[in-house]
Amino acid sequence: MPAHGRLSIPVPCQREKGTYPFFEEKQSSVVRKHNNKWRVVDIVVAAIIAVASGVIFWGWDIVCTAPLALFGAVTPGFEGLLNAFWLFAGPLAAIIVRKPGAALFAETLAAALELTMGNQWGVGGSLIVGIMQGFGAEIGFAVFAYRKWDLLSTTIAGALAGIGCGLYYWITNPAWSTVRASIYLGTSIISGAVLAGMVMYFLQQAIAKTGVLDRFESGRAQVLV
């Protein structure tokens, strides 16, 4: 019985800030959001990836004639299996900088550089198809609202880049039979999914382990996407 017949109401314990660091850390992580705003460093890195990719595209232009002919001789349309060497810029840039538009930006810039350096494909077979490939890769991440940057989304992005490539050549080659065009489209999708998607995802993982991507979400150990 309290003294003087008065009820004493216990005062709730006041927790000092920092008493439960684990709780505070979990709470703060819940409110963190993926930042879609481009930084200068994002633009620079995406451009570097695009330039390096464009040089690789151009180098592949030089040596691709014989391999394409060989695959096409096996079955018309099988040459689409080699298209991924022109598809990877978008998915790779996107999973590194993780910003909307990165895939389209990198693939288009790489294609523009490839065209500028000179090749046998011209504007359509370099720049136009590059834009279509970039749009395809972009859709692969956009369908997840730019919050999923894993193996699945990257593989889908690579496959959709392959669709962009396959559709361009289907449209611009009306003499192709439906069978050949379908095979070309299918092999382009497979090529994009495997090399431009899966392989680029594991390449990004390997690069991240070196620490050079620490300024990006893709390079940090714990990322909320």
Describe the function of each predicted region.
Residues I49-F57, G90, E114, Q133, ...:
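Alpha-helical transmembrane segments of multipass membrane proteins
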Residues A69-F71, R147-V225:
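Membrane-embedded alpha-helical hairpins and interfacial helices in multi-pass inner-membrane proteins
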